[in-house]
Curated annotation (Swiss-Prot):
Residues annotated as transmembrane: 544-564
Molecular function as annotated in GO: DNA binding; DNA-binding transcription factor activity
Cited Pfam families: NAM
Taxonomic lineage from the root: Eukaryota, Viridiplantae, Streptophyta, Embryophyta, Tracheophyta
Presence of the UniProt keyword Nucleus in the record: yes
Compartment annotation: Membrane; Nucleus
Residue numbers spanned by region Disordered: 393-436
InterPro entries: NAC-dom, NAC_dom_sf
Domain comment in the entry: The NAC domain includes a DNA binding domain and a dimerization domain.
Function, in words: Transcriptional activator activated by proteolytic cleavage through regulated intramembrane proteolysis (RIP). Transcripition activator associated with the induction of genes related to flavonoid biosynthesis and required for the accumulation of anthocyanins in response to high light stress. Plays a role in the regulation of 20S and 26S proteasomes in response to high light stress.
Name recorded for this polypeptide: NAC domain-containing protein 78
Membrane topology listed for this record: Single-pass membrane protein
Keyword line: Activator, DNA-binding, Membrane, Nucleus, Stress response, Transcription, Transcription regulation, Transmembrane, Transmembrane helix
Length: 567
């Protein structure tokens, strides 16, 4: 197995592509006659060789138990569609159905599984050799007229036993003896590539060389920048330069090569036996296979190809810029500062201190604290209750009443009450009485009392307008009485009595004397009188009937006793 061959891979490196990679990259490039970056698949006629002879024909010399080959299909008939899969000692038999290989939602190829049988059909002996045959199925190539069935890609492996072996690993086990005295090993053409690379090609830049400016470069103070250039986040305010249009120029200190409006690029062409250069900081087009469309005349709708000239010069107005302009700032020089980047103090950036509430200009905090002053919470019942002299035309009781006048007033009040209880219960009569009290100047006490009783508001009759059955029943029960009492209160203030009178208990703590007057009016209810008279008549009649029944019963009993005693 040729350990010293140039195609040997180091331990751990294996050629194990996926189905999509086999179809979309390797088989498609082979059909389109395009070169490979690393040619690992050989071309052979699978159906002219036995499976155990194929490992020696592989380009990859390893002990792995799977091999890859390009093969041409052999038609059984020149004008037919059947394929001749017979070898000298056996044949490959199809097993199962063909499976689709998809790239997203698009079908890009088909996969067929075949098993090798010794002998001739239909009595062949089944073996453990299995082949996966991949064929291309691309609508774009079909429209372009590219023959897709010119080649098929075959993956051949040998199972460890009969039956399905899903998930079986076909990698060779590691043998330490094979690599004990192994020296430096290169992949194909890697040594030639390393010899052709000079030390002064500036492909690799040491970090110590950043402070040194190359002498062969022409440095400009200000170079125009393309409109679609992305400045990134490395810029500050426009205070670092005095340029008229700092957004379209690079600040001094950025080394740019004068190449006629283009950026000079290192040579990175990929020949058939060349290995790509991986350079940190460059931006490459995002594509799984960037070169798969070159050579077939087919443009994929999902892939954008970059066009380059023969002298390896790339136009700078592309979003795939290979020169990291924002990485070549020198330590002691100012950063690029375009004016289209937002400064930090433009008000659009929210700081933590901005979340606090700003104090208004016309707001005085001292007035707010003095609004709820405890001195203004002093309770004054006179302000809440209003003045005590709430009766109209009320005279002040500052004079000390004489005992004789007080006796006359009390006597006059008794006479008025007796006159009121004499049976005069109508409201018109009561109003006349109050008018009489007002017209009598010799009874000031009763005059004040009448004013007070007249100031008492009458109850509202709103509830009587919406009487329900329960309310009417309660009202009837309440109005069944014949006596209604009306009460009023009169307050006498600023009145002094003799110390030995013994009447100090009648004053409250404020020195006021409260007098409660009650007036009772007897009303005659005609309905109750009528019902009472009917009840008396009924009782009298029942009593008479009862007495007549007793008289009749006694007379009959007496008659019977007389007759019995006579016999």
């Amino acid at each position: 197995m040729g350990r010293g061959s140039v195609t040997s891979l180091a331990p751990g490196f294996r050629f194990h592509p996926t189905d999509e990679e086999l179809v979309r990259y390797y088989l498609k490039r082979k059909v389109c006659n395009k070169p490979f970056k690393f040619d690992a698949i050989s071309v052979t006629d699978i159906y002219k060789s036995e499976p155990w002879d194929l490992p020696d024909k592989s380009k990859l010399k390893s002990r792995d138990l799977e091999w890859y080959f390009f093969s041409m299909l052999d038609k059984k008939y020149s004008n037919g569609s059947k394929t001749n899969r017979a070898t000298e000692k056996g044949y490959w038999k199809t097993t199962g159905k063909d499976r689709e290989i998809r790239n997203g939602s698009r079908v890009v190829g088909m996969k067929k599984t075949l098993v090798y049988h010794k002998g001739r059909a239909p009595r062949g002996e089944r073996t453990n050799w299995v082949m996966h045959e991949y064929r291309l199925s691309d609508e774009d190539l079909k429209k372009a007229g590219v023959p897709q069935e010119a080649y098929v890609l075959c993956r051949i492996f040998q199972k460890s036993g009969t039956g399905p072996k899903n998930g079986e690993q076909y990698g060779a086990p590691y043998l330490e003896e094979e690599w004990e005295e192994d020296g430096m090993t290169y992949v194909p053409a890697q040594d030639a590539f390393s010899e052709g690379l000079a030390l002064n090609d500036d492909v690799y830049v040491d970090i110590d060389d950043i402070d040194e400016k190359p002498e062969n470069l022409v440095v400009y103070d200000a170079v125009p920048i393309l409109p679609n250039y992305c400045h990134g986040e490395s810029s500050n305010n426009v205070e670092s330069g005095n340029y008229s249009d700092s957004g379209n120029y690079i600040q001094p200190g950025n080394n740019v090569v004068d190449s006629g409006g283009y950026f000079e690029q290192p040579i990175e062409t990929f020949e058939e036996d060349r290995k790509p250069i991986i350079r940190e900081g460059s931006i490459q087009p995002c594509s799984l296979f960037p070169e798969e469309q070159i050579g077939c005349g087919v443009q994929d709708e999902n892939v954008v190809n970059l066009e380059s000239s023969n002298n390896n010069v790339f136009v700078a107005d592309t979003c795939y810029s290979d020169i990291p302009i924002d990485h070549n700032y020198l330590p002691d020089e100012p950063f690029m500062d375009p004016n289209n980047n937002l400064p930090l103090n433009d008000g659009l950036y929210l700081e933590t201190n901005d979340l606090s509430c700003a104090q208004q200009d016309d707001f005085n905090f001292e007035d707010y604290l003095s609004f709820f002053d405890d001195e203004g919470l002093t309770f004054d019942d006179s302000l809440l209750m209003g003045p005590e002299d709430f009766l109209p035309n009320q005279e002040a009781l500052d004079q000390k009443p004489a005992p004789k006048e007080l006796e006359k007033e009390v006597a006059g009040g008794k006479e008025a009450v007796e006159e009121k209880e004499s049976g005069e219960g109508s409201s018109s009569k009561q109003d006349t009485d109050f008018k009489d009290f007002d017209s009598a100047p010799k009874y000031p006490f009763l005059k004040k009392t009448s004013h007070m009783l007249g100031a008492i508001p009458t109850p509202s009759s709103f509830a009587s307008q919406f009487q329900t059955k329960d309310a009417m029943r309660l009202h009837a029960a309440q109005s069944s009485g014949s006596v209604h009492v009306t009460a009023g209160m009169m307050r006498i203030s600023n009145m002094t009595l003799a110390a030995d009178s013994g009447m100090g208990w009648s004053y409250d703590k404020n020195g006021n004397l409260n007098v409660v007057l009650s007036f009772g009016v007897v009303q005659q209810d005609d309905a109750m009188t009528a019902s009472g008279s009917k009840t008396g008549i009924t009782a009298t009649r029942a009593m008479l009937v009862f007495m007549c029944l007793w008289v009749l019963l006694l007379s009959v009993s007496f008659k019977i006793v007389t007759m019995v005693s006579a016999r």
